[in-house]
């Protein structure tokens, strides 16, 4: 379980970090190399989920989506300095509950 959580966090940081660098390049006129580095990090994001031990692509990506929501809220708060409101936190917790059900529910 710890390994799965670490991989979800790494994938989220790669997706958000890479996307953020591309955003800075295209939306905030940062140098071209921001976009190149962002693109390379996004390629890494595409590889990380394949290291998960869960057998189903759909389940891994659906569960990762919930983790992504949490990380995006935290990124916005820490990097963009946009303080999440109560609804952001409630929605993020709901996503984590859903992820937990999807990944660790007892199945036959």
Swiss-Prot record:
It is a multi-pass membrane protein. It is found in: Cell membrane. GO terms for cellular component: plasma membrane. Keywords: Cell membrane, Membrane, Transmembrane, Transmembrane helix. The keyword Transcription regulation does not apply. The keyword Membrane applies. InterPro entries: UPF0060. Disulfide bonds: none annotated. Signal peptide: none annotated. The chain crosses the membrane at residues 5-25, 31-51, 60-80, 86-106. HAMAP family: UPF0060 (MF_00010). Belongs to the UPF0060 family. This is UPF0060 membrane protein DSY4629. The lineage of its organism: Bacteria, Bacillati, Bacillota, Clostridia, Eubacteriales.
């Amino acid at each position: 379980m710890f390994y799965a959580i670490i991989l979800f966090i790494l994938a989220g940081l790669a997706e958000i970090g890479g996307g953020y660098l591309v955003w800075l390049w295209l939306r905030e006129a940062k140098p071209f190399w921001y976009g190149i580095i962002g693109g390379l990090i996004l390629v890494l994001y595409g590889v990380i989920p394949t290291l998960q031990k869960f057998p189903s692509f759909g389940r891994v990506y659906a569960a990762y989506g919930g983790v992504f929501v949490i990380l995006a809220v935290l990124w916005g708060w820490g990097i963009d300095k946009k303080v999440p409101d109560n609804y952001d936190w409630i929605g993020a917790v709901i996503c984590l509950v859903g992820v937990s059900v999807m990944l660790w529910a007892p199945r036959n």
